Amino acid sequence: MLDSVTDLASLLKDPTLLATKSYVAGEWIAADDGSTFPVTNPARGDVICQLPNLGRAETARAIKAAHAAHREWAARTAKERAQVLRKWFDLCMANQDDLATILTAEMGKPLAEAKGEIAYGSSYIEFYGEEAKRTYGDIIPG
């Protein structure tokens, strides 16, 4: 262990990518009771950030918000959904280095492997964004 706490945000081009709250219903929230838990770098053992220790009430609110968001998402046109997914893909790829740095610190894996994982995972977003344009009805023709 080199030190007990790593200032991971200082290693990022865009430190806002290191979220230390939970995203629920369009807002970044802390635990109702303010409790947190440490996220440690398994390769070094140092703490890279503290995250909210959400309880039952916060989890129930998150599930309710996700259910409502799904209805809103389903109401979008195929083209709108494709545009959102494309934007998400573009953002992932534009921030690949920072996301890989976070992944490396969180998982302890080599940076090159983390960069590949970001690209690979993002390729699924790109694929489904393209598929979102294709509305066939209930069954995709075979």
Kindly give the residue locations of the regions a language model identified:
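Terminal low-complexity tails and localization/encapsulation signals of metabolic enzymes
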Residues: M1-Q50, Q83, K87, T135-G142
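Glycine-rich loop-to-alpha-helix module at the N-terminal edge of alpha/beta enzyme cores
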Residues: D46-Y136
